[in-house]
Amino acid sequence: MAVVVIAEKPSVAEDIAKVLGVSKKNDTHWESDDLIITWAVGHLLELKTPEEYDDRLKDWRKSVELLPFIPEKFELKPNSGRGTNRKQLTAIKKLISSKSCTEIVNACDAAREGELIFRRIVEFSKAKVPMSRMWLQSMTPDSIMRAYDGRLDSSSYSKLRDAAVSRAEADWIIGMNGSRIASTFLRTGRNDGTSMSLGRVQTATLALIVDKELEILGHKAEPFWELEVDFKSGNSEWSARWERRNNVEDKDNPLTKAHRITEETEKQELEKLLNSDGKFLTKQQHRDSKENPPLNYDLTSLQREANSMWSWTSKRTLSVAQQLYDTHKLTTYPRTDSRYLPEDMIETIGKTIAQLGAQNHLKSHSQRLTDNGLQNVSRNFNDSKVSDHYAIIPTGKIPQGNLTGDAEKLYDLICRQFLSSFHPPAIWDVQTRVTTKDNHDFKKEVRILKEAGWREVKPKSNSIPEKWNSLDNNPAATEATSHKFKEELTKPTNRLKEAKLLSLMENAGRSIDDEAMAEAMKGKGLGTPATRADTIEKLISRNFIQRARSGSLRATAGGIKLIELLRAIPVEWITSPELTGDMEEKLSSVQNGEFSRQQYMKIIFDKAEEMVTRIKNHDRSELFKDINSIGNCPKCNEQLTETVLSYICPKNEGRGSGCDFVFWKNTSGRWFDRSTAARLLDVKELTDLHGFFNRSGEPYVASVKINDSGTVEFLGGGESTSSSDDDELCECPACERGTIRVNSTMYACDNQECKFRGLSQEMCKRKISVDEAKEIFVEGKSKLLDDFTSKKGRPFSAYLKLDGNRVKFEFPPRKAAAGAKEFPVVAGVVAICPKTKEEIVETPTFYQPSNDGSDCKIQIAREMSSRAISRDEAKQLIEKGEIGPFDDFVSKKTGKNFTSILYLKKNQAVGYKFAKK
């Protein structure tokens, strides 16, 4: 008789086996006389797709009347992944269905997904024996043994199961029905590269990024000045900024900030003040500012800090944190939403702190806590704020020198946060100098560390100028040694980086900096800490958003279009972070037993019905009819109407009939929001307009105008062109009037009227050097360049070639497959390429151009489908474009002969054309 333990992955199973003394290893499990340790490989089972319940649902378009489709009972099937997954599932099913199995122990991750993985396996296997649960908080031997000895009956986790199953079914219902109805009814004529899909958390997260993007695109740059003055008093020197007294700031108007000067009269008054006689007087004030130590990390706060410090993606941080937990056993369970510790862990924490002292770089901090005792105990230890898991902290185990660079950095960050949390606050001396003359103030503030406290562990520099020094008197006579009016333009807010997006997701779209307020929002966010990284990556893979090299995220045209469509229909709940957060809170209530699974699923059924009905029944021509027009047609003066894709004249009847004015919202790499489009119609020209993106996803500015004939015209500028301040490279090959110059991200023409798109300094993750760029512009083509990386992460080589107004990739002849048959080579020309007049010759494996860098694309394999292609046949194929039919080709799949004609396609590749039967 045996107990079967199911872990979530092989490495965890091995750790459990070692601790429990199970030493015999088989292909699919570890075993002893009375204990078997096996493993899943993540999700071995998944929910069946709609067409597996009903054949009619195979055709998405023809089956829309069957939507929303909700199975009476959800059914499982083996995951459509690798064959090894099926083998492992079969093995587990056999083990837990065996008559010798007396108990099944769930040792999968102690969270919703781990519960779901285990419950699905048991349900699919139809096992009927008692079940229990190991709740693993860390992977140290002591923790594993405690979890095994203290395992509880699975019924104790029935609410966790309800929440896990409800989450999976809710995502299936919204995702499957939403994606089908969206693909059928929301597609537009323009291909924007997006994969049309809707999701309960995914779409609300996209809405956050779209709203930020529209805010940025709609920003109108306004001019202002800032006044900086250099002061001197005794041996003290500093710079200070003018600030308006009794200023009333409007948060929606950045020009109302106290230090911004918008009126020429105010600027002139300040100029007069600075040039007049009379001394300035400086008063200095001191105040102490307490900076409390941080809480320990939960997953989201760890991801945010790693993104802020090192620009790591959420996915990267989670991956490294998972390694530290299950591979190295150095930190506790990472997928937690708590930043607190259980009250019964105080003694354990003391031991952990002492153990960390064995590492030289942490020794002094550990010793300080040992000598002085722990601070903030009542704050850090709080049972009411610990849910399934406590905060991410070190286990006390010492690294063995086998950590990667990423793992070492993240481990050190977690250790320092942990030690900091038990230190006293840091006290800063905040010194403020206000220099005054004739009721005008010039302010400067510095912060000097007075009592280090927790900043001993996580240091931060003083913000003190080199010659700050002490004032001789207070107040002190002061002279202005120089001044500068800096002319600036207001800038749009920054695009979201993952640190900020994670915070918004955690708080359902609300920007919350206060820790207590953030804690009150727990459970009301979008998704969970464990799923947020995947949500972001899904949006990127589906081309709804893009991640720039800087790490900032922007909504693509496809993403903006989808959210605008859903709101116009309207299906407001799926684009609302607040409403989605409320649904997430109800899911947490299911897990806590405060809300039933049936109640939650009823909400999901109703939402799915509403979504499908509204999308199916919407009339696209009516979506924007109640929205005010952005302006009049520049050609005929009619009020423009808005569509999903454009601002168009109502007299535009298409096919050249009526007024032909149309202004596409997605134009030249920019989405033209309503306010920007309206401004263009009003003033006729917008110069240095931000919000354009090149094909590499990098931003640039450009100018756009409506010309005398009423046509929208792009003038170039910014990153697609250069200015005379940029370094000169060579003459522009496109317009022959401008000069190619090197700006911050591009090699581009300085002629504002040139249509050349420029060459990005980085293409497919490879830097293009100045010499390589010059060769392209002067010679028309580069040498063969290595080290490009495809979207799938694969390396490749290519030429870069001028093609009209752009630079494109040109790929070298492909190499023969490994093991390809080689033939003797006969010297001489086989044929002449009819397109390029290039000589075609023999190689051991191909008939191809004699010059590797040729424009000719002919490359005929000397053996195709196990049939040798003779020299004469190759000549005929090149000159006539077709040979055959031949009946001695052999299929790779079946091994049987087949008959086919060979022909040259338009791109000069060889294709098969099957003879009519």
Question: What is each model feature region?
Answer:
Residues 251-295, 670:
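Metal- or metallocofactor-binding catalytic centers and their adjacent structured scaffolds
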